[in-house]
Amino acid sequence: MKRFLLSALVALGVVSASAQSYLVDNPANRAYFGIRVGGEVTCPGKITGGPVGIKFFNNGGGVEFGGIYNIPVVANFYVEPGLKLYYNTYSVKKDWVDLFQDDIVLDGVSVRKFGMRVPVMAGYHFDFTRDVRLHLFTGPELEVGFSGKEHISGKNIDMSSSIYGDDGNMNRVDVLWGAGVGLAYDHFYFGVSGSFGLCNMYNDSSVKFHENRVTFSLGYNF
């Protein structure tokens, strides 16, 4: 009986040590590709000039689609570059739309953007089992706008104009800092992240405006 109990305790110790090892240093780590699709809440910041700031835009929404490549570095630490396409929108608050009206009755003014994102995340995953992993990650993200339109709609008016270039007042390129958490089960992935704009998106240095967002992602890892 004592020999049986001793064997059981040894076996439990081996299992416990193995589980702890996988939790922070899984020897089965390997590089892999993954696809990601996400829905996002766009959170434009205040427009500020000196000490004065105004909330000019409502929050909006958007989608993104792309891929990642997860590269193990040491233990369960990894680097994960990616490439994604996005489309998102946000609108001018109704109080400001009403203020701009003159002879034209406006229903709304919105910003619509399409472009590319290149995130480079650094993270660590905790492997609770062979199939269940919790990811914590953070890092920079380059965002380049291919197309951006200010759309005005109202009674007897429906028009769009570019927000970039000589006729626009916004910059195409932004750098954001992101952080988030993800849960992987087998090959499937779900994550939530926030990204905070670091660059002034107005091309007038006397005015400051930053774009932020929250993203909910689904994915598959190969």
Q: Where are the model-predicted features located?
A:
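Cleavable N-terminal export/targeting peptides
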Residues: 1-29
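Local alpha-helix boundary/kink/capping signal
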Residues: 14-17, 87, 125, 146
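Short glycine/proline- and aromatic-enriched beta-strand/turn motifs that initiate or cap beta-hairpins
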Residues: 20-66
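Outer-envelope beta-barrel architecture signal
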Residues: 27-35, 75-79, 112-114, 130-134, ...
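Residues on the lipid-exposed face of transmembrane beta-strands in outer-membrane beta-barrel proteins
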Residues: 35-39, 63-73, 83-85, 118-124, ...
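Extracellular/periplasm-exposed beta-strand and loop segments of Gram-negative cell-envelope proteins
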Residues: 42-59, 88-115, 143-178, 200-211
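Structural signature of Gram-negative outer-membrane beta-barrels, strongest in the C-terminal barrel
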Residues: 109-125, 129-149
